């Protein structure tokens, strides 16, 4: 009952972890920004990395050493993954936002003072991660990867367009946040406004999407 299963005992132990978690977010996003120039401007051609689902030793994940030289890591081009769906209105809008973001970071890069401003870096890092998430969605769409979070064989173009409507909206909100940063320069504020766009939402398609989601209500049952 209420007297036996109290929440406060759990809360007292868990609440102290929240500041640590928040600090981790800032640190991780600051580290992510080291990848930004090489990632956005990636033009090199590299062999495609296959999906592996075999039972193999993956201890290397936990023995990667210090986070040195992150800014020198090379990436394959991210754009082809998105361009295969650029005929979808929200994917096209998102690509335009990414181009505007690339122009911002290349022409109005963070100043030395801003590189010490965690609030500014957090907003910039969140904008950058949207591009990475979008690439992962497009690469996984329609792929069968049983037992993984990227198992999406049933994802249709309608699903992709609806997901990118969220990306477009989120990037716009983050751009407003960047525009309002106290340390932002006039040039950065002007460039941030170029990222603001409205997603394309078709009423009939939206209703079909909602109906599909509602059909999944109570479909999942927790294993015993």
Regions found by a protein language model. Name each.
Residues 1-224:
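Flavin-dependent oxidoreductase catalytic core characteristic
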């Amino acid at each position: 009952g209420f007297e036996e299963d109290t929440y406060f005992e759990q809360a007292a132990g868990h609440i102290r972890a929240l500041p640590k978690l928040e600090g981790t977010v800032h640190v991780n996003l600051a580290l992510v920004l080291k990848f930004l120039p090489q990632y956005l401007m990636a033009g090199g051609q590299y062999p495609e990395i296959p999906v592996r689902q075999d039972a193999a030793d993956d201890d290397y994940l936990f023995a990667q050493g210090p986070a040195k030289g992150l800014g020198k890591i090379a990436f394959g081009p991210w754009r082809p993954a998105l361009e295969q769906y650029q005929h979808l209105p929200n994917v096209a809008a998102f690509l335009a936002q990414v181009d505007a973001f690339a122009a911002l970071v290349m022409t109005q890069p963070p100043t030395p003072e801003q590189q010490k401003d965690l609030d500014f870096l957090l907003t910039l890092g969140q904008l950058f991660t949207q591009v990475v998430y979008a690439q992962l969605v497009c690469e996984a769409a329609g792929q069968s990867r049983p037992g993984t979070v990227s198992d999406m064989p049933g994802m249709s173009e309608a699903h992709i367009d609806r997901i990118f409507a969220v990306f477009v909206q989120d990037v716009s909100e983050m751009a407003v946040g960047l525009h309002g940063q106290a340390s932002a320069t006039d040039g950065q504020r002007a460039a941030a406004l170029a990222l603001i766009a409205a997603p394309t939402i078709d009423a009939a398609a939206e209703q079909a999407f909602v109906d599909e989601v509602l059909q999944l209500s109570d479909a999942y049952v927790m294993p015993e």
